[in-house]
């Protein structure tokens, strides 16, 4: 429109790539300063939430700018640090999802933090912002080093977050276990990155892909070849990233950390870092290592990891009586489902990537709704056993019916968004030649009915002497927003499917 100044005219295009990161960083600094001067800490929660929402709005406004859209379509998206950070459709989508996760966690945790973290009230939100910033760098990076830096910012902040209940033995144990295993996984990942650099002579993903496609000083000059160094580098990368998403066989940390960490922290871990790590896997393996004959090799390994994660996660979840441990193993199984799309992206890249993006979004909004209820139950009476949910349909009908819908979605029963997500994963796997993996995914979905049904049966059929729950505005709002998200993604799925397909097609 005449007279309307576009976003790209106001801001240097190179800064557009990190504008949401700058807003989150500024929010973090503002909260730290205000924390030192304000005695009323609870009001600062809304400052934190406002900064995250502002960062989300900046993504929407930037992504809708015609000049930026034209640049992305022409293969010239806004870049920063010489192309190490990039603002393409994939970046916009994943940053929007991650900021949405952070916003919901901030909202659901307000009462819990006020009750249990009086001595570290604002530290909790400051660390949430730091983790969010690290995740955003992970998904925005087109360089192995910046991906690793983002991952380490995420990981180190997460270790602190897991142990933020300083006087709680389980929280301290969770932090220690997470730190020891996470530091080892980070070292393995860094070693893998160094081997990839040694093979290709670059840490920039486009240059890595070009070197592998055309030969380098280590890869045979006659063409691409699987050298021992390259195989070792890919293997170490898979182990490191597999740990971050809690994929079998490097999943053992997840149940203990999920159980011991504060419930809002567990909610954050189950959706945020997992989604960011999945996006980083796509960046590295599709954007850097997505060159024949390498794709079919790493795709098969991810397919095997997906199969193991689905099966182990669901089978062990059947045996759990602690609902946080049950959801930890459910999260491992969900990671397996998402890895089906990662495996499919090796041969059907656009459809595979699109299915991963859609499922990450659907899983995040569903899982956060579940953990919002779990958070209220924990803060109300330390109720973390499945039996503690007896009679919840009478104690709080909203929570009981919301959990029922969320469980139905995670199982993948039509017509929920969970069914749509699994259908897209199934279709991508079948199109890539992994029909056996698609069938195994369907079988595992049936297995998962067992442990979800146990909770539903306790909520609706068992009698209880537990009192009614004290109202919590933040948690109730989170449950309602999650319900709205699940319903909206189910009824109005087509725009979101198109959005994920466009983001997948523009992955650089």
Swiss-Prot record:
Q: How does it sit in the membrane?
A: Multi-pass membrane protein
Q: Does the keyword Membrane apply?
A: yes
**Which GO molecular-function terms appear in the entry?**
NADH dehydrogenase (ubiquinone) activity; NADH:ubiquinone reductase (non-electrogenic) activity; quinone binding
Transmembrane spans: 14-34, 43-63, 90-110, 119-139, 144-164, 179-199, 223-243, 275-295, 298-318, 327-347, 353-373, 400-420, 433-455, 473-493
Q: Does the record carry Nuclease as a key word?
A: no
One Gene Ontology cellular component annotation held by this UniProt entry: plasma membrane
Domain of life of the organism encoding this protein:
Bacteria
Catalytic reactions of this protein: a quinone + NADH + 5 H(+)(in) = a quinol + NAD(+) + 4 H(+)(out)
The principal location of this protein is membrane
Tell me where it resides: Cell membrane
Q: What is its EC number?
A: 7.1.1.-
* This protein's UniProt keywords: Cell membrane, Membrane, NAD, Quinone, Translocase, Transmembrane, Transmembrane helix, Transport
Q: Could you describe the subunit structure of this protein?
A: NDH-1 is composed of 14 different subunits. Subunits NuoA, H, J, K, L, M, N constitute the membrane sector of the complex.
Family recorded in the similarity comment: Belongs to the complex I subunit 2 family.
The role this protein plays is: NDH-1 shuttles electrons from NADH, via FMN and iron-sulfur (Fe-S) centers, to quinones in the respiratory chain. The immediate electron acceptor for the enzyme in this species is believed to be a menaquinone. Couples the redox reaction to proton translocation (for every two electrons transferred, four hydrogen ions are translocated across the cytoplasmic membrane), and thus conserves the redox energy in a proton gradient.
Q: Which PANTHER family match?
A: NADH DEHYDROGENASE (PTHR22773)
Q: What is this protein called?
A: NADH-quinone oxidoreductase subunit N 2
Q: Which organism is it from?
A: Symbiobacterium thermophilum (strain DSM 24528 / JCM 14929 / IAM 14863 / T)
């Amino acid at each position: 429109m005449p007279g309307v100044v576009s976003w790209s005219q106001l801001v240097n295009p190179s800064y557009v790539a990190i504008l949401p990161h700058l807003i989150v960083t500024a929010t973090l600094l503002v909260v730290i300063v205000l924390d030192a001067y304000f005695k009323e800490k609870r009001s600062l929660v809304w400052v934190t939430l406002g900064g995250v929402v502002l960062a989300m709005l900046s993504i929407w406004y930037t992504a809708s700018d015609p000049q930026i859209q034209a640049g992305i379509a022409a293969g010239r998206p806004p870049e920063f640090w010489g192309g190490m950070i990039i603002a393409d459709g994939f970046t916009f989508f994943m940053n929007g999802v991650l900021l949405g996760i952070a916003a919901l966690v901030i909202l659901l945790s307000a009462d819990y933090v006020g009750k249990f973290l009086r001595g570290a009230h604002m530290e909790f939100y400051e660390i949430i912002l730091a983790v969010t910033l690290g995740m955003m760098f992970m998904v925005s990076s087109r360089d192995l080093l910046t991906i690793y830096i983002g991952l380490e910012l995420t990981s180190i902040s997460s270790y602190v977050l897991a142990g933020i209940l300083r006087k709680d033995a389980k929280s301290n144990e969770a932090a220690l276990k997470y730190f020891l295993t996470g530091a080892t996984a980070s070292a393995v990942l860094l070693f893998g990155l160094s081997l990839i650099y040694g093979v290709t002579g670059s840490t920039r993903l486009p240059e890595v892909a070009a070197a592998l496609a055309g030969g380098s000083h280590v890869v045979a000059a006659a063409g691409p070849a699987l050298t021992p160094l390259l195989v070792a580098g890919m293997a170490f990368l898979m182990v490191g990233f597999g740990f971050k998403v809690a994929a079998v066989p490097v999943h053992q940390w997840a149940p203990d950390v999920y159980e011991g960490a504060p419930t809002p922290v567990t909610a954050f871990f189950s959706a945020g870092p997992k989604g960011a790590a999945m996006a980083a896997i796509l960046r590295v393996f599709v954007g850097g290592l997505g060159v024949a004959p390498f794709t079919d090799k790493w795709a098969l390994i991810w397919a095997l990891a997906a199969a193991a994660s689905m099966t182990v996660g669901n089978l062990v979840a059947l045996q759990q009586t602690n609902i946080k441990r049950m959801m930890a193993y459910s999260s491992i199984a969900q990671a397996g489902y998402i890895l089906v799309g990662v495996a499919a992206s090796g041969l059907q890249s656009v459809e595979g990537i699109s299915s991963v993006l859609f499922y990450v979004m659907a899983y995040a909004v569903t899982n956060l709704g579940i953990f919002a209820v779990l958070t209220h139950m924990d803060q109300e009476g330390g109720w973390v056993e499945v039996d503690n949910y007896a009679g919840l349909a009478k104690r709080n009908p909203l929570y009981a019916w919301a959990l029922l819908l969320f469980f139905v979605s995670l199982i993948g029963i039509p017509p929920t968004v969970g069914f749509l997500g699994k259908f897209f994963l199934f279709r991508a796997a079948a199109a890539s030649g992994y029909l056996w993996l698609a069938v195994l995914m369907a079988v595992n979905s049936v297995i998962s009915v067992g442990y979800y049904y146990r909770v539903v049966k306790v909520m609706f059929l068992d009698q209880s002497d537990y009192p009614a729950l004290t109202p919590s505005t933040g948690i109730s709002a989170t449950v309602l927003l999650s319900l709205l998200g699940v319903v909206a993604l189910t009824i109005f799925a087509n725009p979101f499917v198109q959005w994920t397909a466009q983001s997948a097609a523009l992955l650089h």
